[in-house]
Amino acid sequence: MTKQKVCPVCGSTEFIYDPERGEIVCARCGYVIEENIIDMGPEWRAFDASQREKRSRTGAPESILLHDKGLSTDIGIDRSLTGLMREKMYRLRKWQSRLRVSDAAERNLAFALSELDRITAQLKLPKHVEEEAARLYREAVRKGLIRGRSIESVIAACVYAACRLLKVPRTLDEISDIARVEKKEIGRSYRFIARNLNLTPKKLFVKPTDYVNKFADELGLSEKVRRRAIEILEEAYRRGLTSGKSPAGLVAAALYIASLLEGEKRTQREVAEVARVTEVTVRNRYKELVEKLGIKVPIT
């Protein structure tokens, strides 16, 4: 039998709940009976049954980064359990873990998403890039595009595609190094996925200028050099010199030229290492830009 609340001031048993303040007050004298009450109800409002059904939820939100989208539950650990019960719960947890990835498709998805987590963490990519890569991979699985390709190459290709879609500057070489997959293999998977998921060149286009700050930071170049490099790249783009060229190679050459023009010289080897391209690539792009744009580089 529950004891009825009584106001200690006036003896009234009538109370008012104020949800905004989290208080229960006496309806007669206004004395605060309880305060700091946590509202366990929903944070939304519904005006009919259908709205209530749509807006109601329980548990944690779904996550595309988990193979089961976070919809399963885990059997917890209680150290106060006796030996036999603890052993029983251990077995249950073990079986539950197996059942969560009970078939090959689930196991492959779980492995792919763990690999995605590793790659994006090491590349220090933002969460929205990781989520976009996961979405692309799930779509590729749904369309049967994984067959005949390694999971590692496809997940790496999805990371590269996500970076390009969201204009986050990362080169194929960087992703290849972290993914531990040959650059050519990732490139093949990337082109295949882009073609079959309708990722058009327009969607995937990354302006070479997006890479300028990234490379300039590593080379320790000033804002003046960066601005000059961007000017060179924008002029090259206007004249149609960037089509079909690697953004990394173009940026490396533009930064090399800008560093010479602004008196902050960096060697071709230095810029090539930062851009993860060969010195030959830097040299070829350098010659093209200087000749086609009529840039007079000081002789050093």
Curated annotation (Swiss-Prot):
A zinc finger (TFIIB-type) spans 2-34. Signal peptide: none annotated. Zn(2+) binds at C7, C10, C26, C29. Gene3D superfamilies: 1.10.472.170, Cyclin-like. One of its GO terms (molecular function) is TBP-class protein binding. InterPro entries: Cyclin-like_dom (IPR013763), Cyclin-like_sf (IPR036915), TFIIB (IPR000812), TFIIB_arc (IPR023484), TFIIB_CS (IPR023486), TFIIB_cyclin (IPR013150), Znf_TFIIB (IPR013137). Coiled coil: none annotated. Keywords: Metal-binding, Repeat, Transcription, Transcription regulation, Zinc, Zinc-finger. GO terms for biological process: transcription preinitiation complex assembly. GO terms for cellular component: transcription preinitiation complex. Sequence repeats lie at residues 114-197, 210-291. Stabilizes TBP binding to an archaeal box-A promoter. Also responsible for recruiting RNA polymerase II to the pre-initiation complex (DNA-TBP-TFIIB). Belongs to the TFIIB family. This is Transcription initiation factor IIB. It comes from Pyrococcus horikoshii (strain ATCC 700860 / DSM 12428 / JCM 9974 / NBRC 100139 / OT-3). The lineage of its organism: Archaea, Methanobacteriati, Methanobacteriota, Thermococci, Thermococcales. The gene is tfb.
